[in-house]
Every structure is written in structure tokens, then in C-alpha cells.
């Protein structure tokens, strides 16, 4: 009798719980690949996070029509049937922001892949697995800031810091942007995990507790106090980019190119060598072996910070959404990456976000749009492709962060674009070019000639050159003039090459022959770089500047000698050793230091002028 009574009580509790939660559940009405339609969803909001089916697959509401909601599911929907439950969570798709982001690899919706592997013992992500993005067991040494009990605090204020790793030794703990109040208690120095309460704030008579982490919806840009104009270069270590087509910290860059042109290599060299504090690398729909390459190479690569070598993985977060992962999650991966970048910008860091490749993201938009039955535009892409791209790129920039103390950070976006067949009139490329300020166009013919980086200097451009002239004038006088001269030589040589193909080189004047010879020298020894060598994998800006001076000095001296009546064929023969010295300038090891480099290059400049003076006598 007692057993029957107990069972009846349990059943009543279960039924009352079901009644309570019934309003939070809908039912699946139809399934079409990653797009699921659910009914009985009155009260749900756009972009609300839902759990689909008995496996609790993660999905997001993207359209509401009456009591029906259309959901894009971020996991494989095989086995989901009509009538399965859909649980509404009442919150948007958000990411966790706090200590532990560095050195971690996530999927498109910020699930930590290593933690999932350890938990599931599988190389694939089990459906419906729910692992927190930030480790709940790792302890961090929290140091409170200058704020104390009784002080007023607003969104973005720094109330403490932790040591995350030797490259990020001052990870600032921020109050979420929408929070404010008066501090009622703050934790003392000590070890805490990301869920432990370290701050208690009272506002309007209510007390709120805050830990070292907070969540933020990925589709909402994090607020800033003020947007600033960017004026400091994003140095890549690639001579052709730093000299001719520079980008700024807080700028937007597009790298379109056909398959095998070296987009991923440029993206990876940016991650390895750029002057950014934090790198967010988003592999969006690219091949899995490219992400595996990053994972294997990065821990072995070192950067020198204040005299000590550190693995660059310590400043990197990877968001891997490879081509065999669900299509819908590609869209989320771009937003996840930019939200992580904005979080570090709010700490006063200069962040580079590399998206490889935004074409795969656009393809995911096209597939979802097609399944929704929306009107297709150019090449089947949705009509809102340009607006989606613009809203993403507009989240880049240099800004003053919210809260105190004052800090300035930046987010630079470098996005690779893979147009089919290398056709730059592709809708994704044209939409991207209308938004981004720097265009590094890759050339298939250069790549086939093994000329890397395969940047086509005649189609590439940067709208930041004038903005950066102030920086160059104060640090490297003559830089702008040298850059313009190199561009002029290259464009003149292109016209002369067409003449040579028609009438031969002998028909050219000596002055034109010099232009052609120096252009070849610039292409082979300045624009080209060997990424597998110690001397050329990374070229500091001072070495780039000194090499520019050497090439232009050689060109000017040759032109001066010919103008004074010397014959170029004889002059070239008698000064061949100087030409060899100029072309060998790239072999100088940057590790020997700037002082030694400048000394060696100034000796080279004086040798050039002396040898030409002797030869023309």
C-alpha cells in the first residue's frame, strides 16, 4: 500500500512538472536537412536558442510564422522525427567569455573539442553533447583591482585580473557591459574557478553576483565608448604587404584567390608573425587538414616577447568548423570568432581575427536560404548577402572600451575569399570588396610559377596608405616616396613587357632596359619570400625599409649613369657584383638585430654609389 502511494505521489509530481514546463516545449512539424519547423512555439523570440529532439540538438530560431518557428539546427538532424519535443531556452545563442579561452580549440558554437574528446573518447562530436566552453575545474589566481566595497561600478569596469599564461599575464576581469550598481563585496586575492562568485553588486535594492566569466549573445556587437580612427600598421612580416598594401590595426582586409594560390599560407603567416596581442583563427568550412596543420605547427612556433621566446599558441584561440561539420554551424562560427575578438578588444588588446574562408560561410547562407524557400539573387545567394557581410565587417575597428580605467583596443578582420575558378566578379568577392579597405588579390599564374606570396601588384590596393604616412614619416622617413617609386617601376615594367613581346628588348632605350631589369630584381628578391627559411619567413619593417632603399638606390644610380652617357649593357656587366649584393640583401638574418642590419645596409648603399661612380668614369 505504501509503495503504491509513493508511486502515485511521484506520478503527480511528474505530471505537475510537465504542466509547468509544457509552455516551454513545442513539437517538430517538419524536417528538411538542418532546417526544422516546430509548432506550438507561441512566445518564442527570433534567434532564441532551442534544444531539438530527444538528443537535445542545439538550434536557433530564424523565422516565426503564427505558432510555427523555423529553426536552423547546428548538429546532424538524422533520426529526428515529427512530434519530437523542442525545448525553448529563453536566451539567444551566446558564448562564454572569461579566463581559459587562450590555447583552446572550439567548434562553431563554442564547444571545446579537446574536452569533448576526453569525455566521449570519440574522434567525432557525439550529438547533443553539452560541455561547458570554459573549464569549471581550473583554478586561477584572482587579484582584485583598485575598486572597493561601496564604490559604484558600471559595465566594462575592470574589477580584477588573473594570470592566464606567460603571454597573457594580465587577463582583465570585466563587469558585463549591461551591468551596474554599488559593490557590496569583492573577493580577496586567491584561487578561484570561473564559476566562483568574486563580486557582488547591489542595484535598485537587488543584489547580483558575478563570477570571472560572463556570457554574451554572438549576433550583438559588444558596445564601446567611442570608435577611433586607426593609424598604426598591422605588420604581417610579408614585404609585399607591409610596403605596398599595408593594413592598419583595426582594419578590414579581403584575400580573394583561386584554389592553391596561398590564401591559407598568408592567413597562417599573419597568425604566426603579426604584431597583434591576440589571434582568433576561424576555420570556416575549410579542409580539416588545414586546421590540423595549424594545431601541429603553432605549438612549435615561437615569438619573442621582451627578450624571451614564447609559443604563439599561447595567444591564439581556434574556432574550427571544418567542411564535414554541419553547414548551419558555419554561420555561427564567424559570429563566435568576432565576439571572442571583441572581448579581448575590450581589455585593451589589439586582436586579429582571421576568417578562412568567408565564401564557405556565404555558401551556408545560400543553403539555408534555399531550404527556407527565399527568393534567390545572383548565383543563388540570398539578396541579404551584402547586408550580412557588412554587419560582420563593421564589428572591426579601433575603439575606446567601456568602463574604467581607459583602454584602447582594436579588432582587425582578415577574411580569405575562395571565388569559384578564381573569378573576382563572384557575388561574395564583389560584396566583400565594397566593404573592406584592403584588397590582397592572389594570382593563379604567379602561384603556378611558384612566386609566393602570389600577390598581384597591379590589382591589389590599400586605402590605408595615406592614413599610415604619418607613422612612416616619424619612424621611417622616405618610406612613402620609396613605396611610390617601386609601384611606378612595376607598372612601367608591365607596359614595357608588352612592347618587348612585340619588338624585342633590343628596341628599348637604356633607361627602359634599367626599368625592366630592376623590376625583375624587385619581383624576385623583394616581393617574393621563402616562408620555410629563417631569414625570410618573417621580415621586420626595418629590414623591408632598408631593402627598399637598396633597390631604389641601385635604380637611381643606374639611371643617373645612363643619363650621363654610359651604356647600360657595359655598365650592367661592370657592376654585376653590386647587383648580386642587392639581390642578396634578403639573406640578412633579422635575428642579428636592427643595429647590425642598418650598419650592413648603409655599407651596401655606399658601395652602390661608389661602384657606379667608378664604372661611369
Swiss-Prot record:
The gene is TFP1. It comes from Candida albicans (strain SC5314 / ATCC MYA-2876) (Yeast). Gene3D superfamilies: 2.40.30.20, 2.40.50.100, Bovine Mitochondrial F1-atpase, Atp Synthase Beta Chain, Chain D, domain 3 (1.10.1140.10), P-loop containing nucleotide triphosphate hydrolases (3.40.50.300). PROSITE patterns: ATPASE_ALPHA_BETA. It is a peripheral membrane protein. The keyword Transmembrane does not apply. Disruption phenotype: Leads to a defect in vacuolar acidification and higher sensitivity to oxidants such as H(2)O(2) or menadione. Reduces strongly virulence in mice. V-ATPase is a heteromultimeric enzyme composed of a peripheral catalytic V1 complex (components A to H) attached to an integral membrane V0 proton pore complex (components: a, c, c', c'', d, e, f and VOA1). Keywords: ATP-binding, Hydrogen ion transport, Ion transport, Membrane, Nucleotide-binding, Translocase, Transport, Ubl conjugation, Vacuole, Virulence. Is a probable target for sumoylation. CDD domains: ATP-synt_V_A-type_alpha_C, ATP-synt_V_A-type_alpha_N, V_A-ATPase_A. Its main location: membrane. It holds the Pfam family ATP-synt_ab_N. Belongs to the ATPase alpha/beta chains family. Catalytic subunit of the V1 complex of vacuolar(H+)-ATPase (V-ATPase), a multisubunit enzyme composed of a peripheral complex (V1) that hydrolyzes ATP and a membrane integral complex (V0) that translocates protons. V-ATPase is responsible for acidifying and maintaining the pH of intracellular compartments. Mediates oxidative stress response, filamentous growth, and plays an important role in virulence. InterPro entries: ATP-synt_VA_C, ATP-synth_a_Xtn, ATP_synth_asu-like_sf, ATPase_a/bsu_AS, ATPase_F1/V1/A1_a/bsu_N, ATPase_F1/V1/A1_a/bsu_N_sf, ATPase_F1/V1/A1_a/bsu_nucl-bd, ATPase_F1/V1_b/a_C. It comes from the Eukaryota. It is found in: Vacuole membrane. Disulfide bonds: none annotated. It catalyses: ATP + H2O + 4 H(+)(in) = ADP + phosphate + 5 H(+)(out). GO terms for cellular component: cytosol; fungal-type vacuole membrane; vacuolar proton-transporting V-type ATPase, V1 domain. One of its GO terms (biological process) is vacuolar acidification. The keyword Signal does not apply. This is V-type proton ATPase catalytic subunit A. Its EC number is 7.1.2.2. The record marks 460 as: Required for activity.
Amino acid at each position: 500500500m505504501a509503495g503504491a502511494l509513493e508511486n502515485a505521489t511521484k506520478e503527480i509530481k511528474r505530471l505537475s512538472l510537465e504542466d509547468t514546463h509544457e509552455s516551454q516545449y513545442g513539437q517538430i512539424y517538419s524536417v528538411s536537412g538542418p532546417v526544422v519547423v516546430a509548432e506550438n512555439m507561441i512566445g518564442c523570440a527570433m534567434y532564441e536558442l532551442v534544444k531539438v529532439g530527444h538528443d537535445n540538438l542545439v538550434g536557433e530560431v530564424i523565422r516565426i510564422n503564427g505558432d510555427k518557428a523555423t529553426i536552423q539546427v547546428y548538429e546532424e538532424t538524422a533520426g529526428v522525427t515529427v512530434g519530437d519535443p523542442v525545448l525553448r531556452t529563453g536566451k539567444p545563442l551566446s558564448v562564454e567569455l572569461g579566463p581559459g579561452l587562450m590555447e583552446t580549440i572550439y567548434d562553431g558554437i563554442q564547444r571545446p573539442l579537446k574536452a569533448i574528446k576526453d569525455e566521449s573518447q570519440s574522434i567525432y562530436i557525439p550529438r547533443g553533447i553539452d560541455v561547458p566552453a570554459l573549464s569549471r575545474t581550473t583554478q586561477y589566481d584572482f587579484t582584485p583591482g583598485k575598486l572597493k566595497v561601496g564604490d559604484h561600478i558600471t559595465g566594462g569596469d575592470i574589477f580584477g585580473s588573473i594570470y592566464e599564461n606567460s603571454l597573457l599575464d594580465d587577463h582583465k576581469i570585466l563587469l558585463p557591459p549591461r551591468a551596474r550598481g554599488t559593490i557590496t563585496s569583492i573577493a580577496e586575492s586567491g584561487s578561484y574557478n570561473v564559476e566562483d562568485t568574486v563580486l557582488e553588486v547591489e542595484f535598485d535594492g537587488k543584489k547580483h553576483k558575478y563570477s570571472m566569466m560572463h556570457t554574451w549573445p554572438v549576433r550583438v556587437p559588444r558596445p564601446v565608448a567611442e570608435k577611433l580612427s586607426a593609424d598604426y600598421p598591422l605588420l604581417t612580416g610579408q614585404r609585399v604587404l607591409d610596403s605596398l598594401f599595408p593594413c592598419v590595426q583595426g582594419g578590414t582586409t579581403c584575400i580573394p584567390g583561386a584554389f592553391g594560390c596561398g590564401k591559407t599560407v598568408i592567413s597562417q603567416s599573419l597568425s604566426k608573425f603579426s604584431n597583434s596581442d591576440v589571434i582568433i583563427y576561424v576555420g570556416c568550412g575549410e579542409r580539416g587538414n588545414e586546421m590540423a596543420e595549424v594545431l601541429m605547427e603553432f605549438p612549435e612556433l615561437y615569438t619573442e616577447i621582451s627578450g624571451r621566446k614564447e609559443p604563439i599558441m599561447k595567444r591564439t584561440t581556434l574556432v574550427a568548423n571544418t567542411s564535414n561539420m554541419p553547414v548551419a554551424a558555419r554561420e555561427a562560427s564567424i559570429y563566435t570568432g568576432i565576439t571572442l575578438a571583441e572581448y579581448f578588444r575590450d581589455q585593451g588588446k589589439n586582436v586579429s581575427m582571421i576568417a578562412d574562408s568567408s565564401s564557405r560561410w556565404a555558401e551556408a547562407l545560400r543553403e539555408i536560404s534555399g531550404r527556407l524557400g527565399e527568393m534567390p539573387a545572383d548565383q543563388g545567394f540570398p539578396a541579404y548577402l551584402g547586408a550580412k557581410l557588412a554587419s560582420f565587417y563593421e564589428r572591426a575597428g579601433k575603439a575606446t572600451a567601456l568602463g574604467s580605467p581607459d583602454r584602447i583596443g582594436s579588432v582587425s578582420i582578415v577574411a580569405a575569399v575562395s571565388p569559384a575558378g578564381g573569378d573576382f566578379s563572384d557575388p561574395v568577392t564583389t560584396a566583400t570588396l565594397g566593404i573592406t579597405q584592403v584588397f590582397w588579390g592572389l594570382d593563379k599564374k604567379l602561384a603556378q610559377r611558384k612566386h609566393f606570396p602570389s600577390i598581384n601588384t597591379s590589382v591589389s590596393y590599400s586605402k590605408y596608405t595615406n592614413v599610415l604616412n604619418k607613422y612612416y614619416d616619424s619612424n621611417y622617413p622616405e618610406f612613402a616616396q620609396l613605396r611610390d617609386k617601386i609601384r611606378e617601376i612595376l607598372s612601367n615594367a608591365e607596359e614595357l613587357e608588352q612592347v618587348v613581346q612585340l619588338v624585342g628588348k633590343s628596341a628599348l632605350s637604356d633607361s627602359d632596359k634599367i626599368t625592366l631589369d630592376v623590376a625583375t630584381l624587385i619581383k624576385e628578391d623583394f616581393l617574393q619570400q621563402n616562408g620555410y627559411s629563417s631569414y625570410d619567413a618573417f621580415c621586420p619593417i626595418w629590414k623591408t625599409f632598408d631593402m627598399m632603399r637598396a633597390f631604389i638606390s641601385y635604380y637611381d644610380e643606374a639611371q643617373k649613369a645612363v643619363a650621363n652617357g654610359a651604356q647600360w649593357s657595359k655598365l650592367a656587366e661592370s657592376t654585376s657584383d653590386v647587383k648580386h649584393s642587392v639581390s642578396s640583401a634578403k639573406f640578412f638574418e633579422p635575428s642579428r638585430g636592427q643595429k647590425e642590419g642598418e650598419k650592413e645596409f648603409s655599407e651596401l648603399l655606399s658601395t652602390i654609389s661608389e661602384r657606379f661612380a667608378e664604372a661611369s668614369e
